[in-house]
Amino acid sequence: LTVKELAMRVNLSTSPTFDRQKRLEREGFIKGYHAILDAKKTDNGMTVLCNMRLKRHSQMLMDDFMVAIQDIEEITECYNTSGEYDFTLKIQTRDMESYQEFMRTKLGNIDSVGYFHSVFVMKEVKNTHGVPVKLG
């Protein structure tokens, strides 16, 4: 979306639209710009939500886990959650075989992991990749 297209959508001229966009970036409201890829076309069409529990609750184990997952490319999202599980991970793999390999060689090798429960996504129904914003 160009600044000109955005300006037309918000009914402003390009200069104030550009200024507002830059201000929102500076103030941290806009964190970045991303292309949204079709996981199936990238040969990573299997989505798994993995609910994970640490071996025990300690800041050190939590920190170790959060550091350990940063460079694991199959983990595309990670949320620290309340309730029965400590974290929910969104994992993208090619198929069941590659997911099993991922669990054996990557997630299963993180010392702080105590238990995990995998939920396999059958169909993505909604994914807006955004945050709702009330205008006005």
Model-predicted segments: where are they?
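A compositional/biophysical signature of low hydrophobicity enriched in polar/charged and small residues
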Residues: 1-136
